[in-house]
């Protein structure tokens, strides 16, 4: 089993030894409740770096709904066993007081890319993400950090953060891992009922159908409206957004030209699912 480190001091001591030996360090930031998507990130890090740290921290600052924070699954023993199978070198699993000690007063906010989509529906969420990620980069002194493309907006926020603050870490975006029926892997999926789980792939299927329609010449607003209707018809309670944007997310696309990203968030069984695909 990989050692589970609880304090920044323990982590820094270990990383200092690795750096002194000239070894490269990769980090995979997670909130635990690990699944094959997370493990694929750890394997990618394992292949690219001499040493791999997986962080497990349920970050209270990125939950704008306290009930969601309480419901978030915490499965550390199971997570550690999964990470042992991948061969990570250390798990960093601090408590909230270690990450945000008494007197902590700094908030990192990335303008622009953090504002639409998730930012509009979850105020403050990306401030919490940016703050904890900046701290984790400082704590781990990582050379490379691995993030899933499933959270595309988060990936764009982290890239902007690193570029703007000259943080010396390379951000690696890794392809979304999906179930056989197309559903993007997510820790939230375990909260779906059996019926909800069967309905859930309708989200990505509607997105794929819209993509094909737009590539075939259908007007973007019409294709998106049909996709939204299909998601609701499949049993989803709400669709927060279903938008075509430039890959950097800064601008909505009214017509299909250049690289775009189709992004969606919808609620099923009271569980909010997000997904995105390239267009």
From Swiss-Prot:
One of its GO terms (molecular function) is pantoate-beta-alanine ligase activity. It comes from the Bacteria. It catalyses: (R)-pantoate + beta-alanine + ATP = (R)-pantothenate + AMP + diphosphate + H(+). Its EC number is 6.3.2.1. SUPFAM superfamilies: Nucleotidylyl transferase. Pathway: Cofactor biosynthesis; (R)-pantothenate biosynthesis; (R)-pantothenate from (R)-pantoate and beta-alanine: step 1/1. The active site is at residue 38. One of its GO terms (cellular component) is cytosol. Beta-alanine binds at residue 62. InterPro entries: Cyt_trans-like (IPR004821), Pantoate_ligase (IPR003721), Pantoate_ligase_C (IPR042176), Rossmann-like_a/b/a_fold (IPR014729). One of its GO terms (biological process) is pantothenate biosynthetic process. It is found in: Cytoplasm. Keywords: ATP-binding, Cytoplasm, Ligase, Nucleotide-binding, Pantothenate biosynthesis. (R)-pantoate binds at residues 62, 154. The keyword Membrane does not apply. The keyword Transferase does not apply. Its main location: cytoplasm. CDD domains: PanC. Catalyzes the condensation of pantoate with beta-alanine in an ATP-dependent reaction via a pantoyl-adenylate intermediate. NCBIfam families: cyt_tran_rel, panC. The reaction proceeds by a bi uni uni bi ping pong mechanism. Belongs to the pantothenate synthetase family. Homodimer. This is Pantothenate synthetase. It comes from Cereibacter sphaeroides (strain ATCC 17029 / ATH 2.4.9).
